[in-house]
Amino acid sequence: MQARHILKMKKNFEQIAKEDARFSPSAIRFVYEGLSLTVKKITVEPRHISGQTLCEGLRKLAVEKWGRMAMVVLNNWGIKTTRDFGEIVYLMIKHKWMSAAETDTMDDFNDVFDFQTVFKDRFEF
């Protein structure tokens, strides 16, 4: 006899990406990493942050990691706007990797910044 596990396991990032098909697993992992780092930079205690604050944290992380190639990397993963960050956040909320406050909406991620401006135009060649 074998014991059956009653608890349902969370889907991993690869499973979420395969099911949704808009974003790569790397995109989902990046947003998750960015949330953790953004919260740590703001406070020592875990707390809620806004969609705009998360987008700014993700922008900084992308520039730190990839510099002038940040837009290319993000676009390759399916992320083309700050709204896409929100789409990933809400996918992760749906799959219990993140949580949201009652006041949070997808609109919090609309047009926080323009990718061309912050990832491409700021670098002079």
Label the model's feature ranges:
Residues 2-125:
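Non-transmembrane, aqueous-exposed alpha-helical and coiled segments at domain scale
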